[in-house]
A protein has these predicted regions:
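Residue-level recognition of short, solvent-exposed, well-ordered loop/turn junctions
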Residues: 23-24, 77, 166, 257, ...
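Glycine-rich cofactor phosphate-binding loops and adjacent beta1-alpha1 units
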Residues: 162-166, 206-285, 346
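Conserved acidic E/D residue at the C-terminus of a beta-strand in Rossmann-like folds
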Residues: 199, 266, 290
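C-terminal hydrophobic helical "lid"/dimerization subdomain
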Residues: 1-3, 250-254, 293-347
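Glycine-rich beta-strand-centered segment in the early N-terminal region that forms part
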Residues: 18-35, 48-97, 137-139
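Short Gly/Pro-enriched turn/cap motifs at secondary-structure boundaries
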Residues: 7, 19-20, 53-59, 111-117, ...
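NAD(P)H dinucleotide-binding glycine-rich loop of Rossmann-like/cofactor-binding domains
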Residues: 92-174, 311
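Mid-domain Rossmann-like dinucleotide-binding core that forms the NAD(H)/NADP(H) cofactor-binding site
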Residues: 138-221, 225
Length: 347
């Protein structure tokens, strides 16, 4: 089969690799129908994730069709169309029993495209299938569903749920990339008074408005002052960081009200300063997290009922064999306007 293979930092190739096979009775083999690219994949290609070694097939998000299932698999069978989650779960360890699948200690967690071969290929082996793939109704489009493999559960669980968004809240989302936009969309489910989006790209602020943000502001145009003006100087109830750089995290801590919450969604590669001398007396709560995907079944139901606008985040489409071109477009989002790119297998 063909797959995108990490060769060394800065270099990948779309080339022939052996087809995957069943290695454990809990496995399924999925023929990939649609796949997307994540910002984490770009970090891997740059060499920022040392656990990913040369020869690894990349990718951790897909929709496809089960072609083979191990003897212990109970929830799907060959021919079923499924969502492949970014998180795999053994279902037996302490963390899985608490539905904290991202922390699985039984061989799961974030493994696809990380410690085992991933989804940016014609076929993928998915371990622990009963908790790692989800049957899809025929009414759900593959390009819409694939965004529920990672960014929507991440935005909802790590941003909205950790942030405790409630009716009447003022919510600020710093970073209007795919994760931030998904956080805006899922925040709207809780009827906040307003959602404020902060970004440097005007096109992304336009997208934020289309997804329900009542106010937008460029990051270089005093967003802290806008938040203060809209909240009588108090600050926001919930501030979400969806960029992953120290400066934006520190900005978030300056925009939250006393007793408010800062929910960090962004993936950070450098230390950020934590001004506890200012925050402790304000009773500010700060949360972090890796997605567990425990919300995926609920989000899939909402998608099937037309309540989740995932299609609005897809800006570019490619065929699976155009993987390297898709990476180029996605990596130059400031020039190309890319939010999410979706690649389809030839029909």
């Amino acid at each position: 089969m063909k797959a995108l293979v990490f060769q060394e930092p800065g270099r990948t190739t779309w080339r022939d690799v052996p087809d995957p096979g069943i290695e454990d009775a809990s496995d399924v083999i999925v023929r990939v129908d649609a796949v997307t690219i994540c910002g984490t994949d770009l970090h891997i290609v740059k060499g920022d994730v040392p656990e990913v070694t040369p020869g690894r097939v990349l990718g951790h998000e897909a929709v496809g069709t089960v072609v083979e299932a191990g003897g212990d698999v109970r929830t799907v069978r060959p021919g079923d169309r499924v969502l492949v989650s970014c998180i795999s779960a053994c279902g037996r360890c302490r963390f899985c029993r608490e539905a904290r699948y991202g922390q699985c200690r039984g061989g799961g967690g974030w493994v696809l495209g990380h410690t085992i071969d991933g989804t940016q290929a014609e076929y993928v082996r998915v371990p622990f299938a009963d908790l790692s793939v989800y049957p899809l109704p025929n009414s759900v489009d593959s390009a819409d569903a694939v965004l529920l493999a990672d960014i929507f559960p991440t935005a909802y669980e790590v941003g909205v749920r950790n942030g405790g968004v409630s009716p009447g809240d003022t919510v600020v989302v710093v970073g209007a990339g795919p994760i931030g936009l998904a956080a805006i969309a899922t925040s709207r489910l809780y009827s906040p008074e307003r959602v404020i989006a902060v970004d440097l790209a005007d096109a992304r602020l336009d997208a934020a408005r289309s997804l329900g943000a009542e106010a937008t502001v460029r990051a270089d145009e005093e967003p802290q002052q806008l938040v203060a003006d809209l909240t009588d100087g108090l600050g926001a109830d919930v501030v979400m960081e969806a960029v992953g750089v120290p400066e934006t995290f520190e900005t978030c801590t300056r925009m939250v009200r006393p007793g408010g919450r800062v929910a960090n969604i962004g993936v950070h590669g450098k230390p950020a300063t934590l001004h506890l001398e200012d925050l402790w007396i304000k009773d500010v709560t700060i949360t972090t997290g890796l997605v567990d995907t425990s919300s995926t079944p609920m989000l899939l139901r909402m998608l099937a009922n037309g309540r989740l606008p995932s299609a609005e985040l897809v800006t570019h489409r490619f065929e699976l064999g155009e993987m390297e071109e898709a990476y180029d477009v996605f990596s130059r989002a400031a020039d190309t306007g890319a939010l999410k790119v979706v690649l389809h297998a030839p029909r």
